[in-house]
Amino acid sequence: MQAPGHFRYDMFSQGIFVDPMPPTSRLDALAQKLHPQQSQFPLVRMGSAADGGYLVPDDLQDIKACFSPGVDTFATFETDLLKRGIGSHLADYSVDKVPDGLQALSFVKKFVGGNTAGHHVALEDWVTQFEPHAKNDELIL
């Protein structure tokens, strides 16, 4: 029989972080806060009409950069941002390079997670590394 906590140590040593499930009451409280918000700006489509596309408020003039975790092999959203002068920092451990045709500000072959270790980088560490002086309201995630 394994000692208590042995499973968590085994997972941690592989760069996998296992935390206890939060109480249901906390999850319910969070779910109550999540709902659509009306924007004062019209929405514009960025990216493809299928996977990889998003409707975003047309209020991008002060945006300095995009942080895009999970790139895959295409980046239509990031390509449309670049047409507006907004470069992207990309992270994805499952691919080896930036998608063809995209000029990225940076690419890290890592998964974005809660902690920086092994094949993972914490969001805060990633942003601090590449945009240390940017304010949160100047970035897109």
Language-model-detected regions and their locations in the chain:
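Phosphate/nucleotide-binding beta-alpha loop and adjacent structural elements of enzyme active sites
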Residues: M1-L141
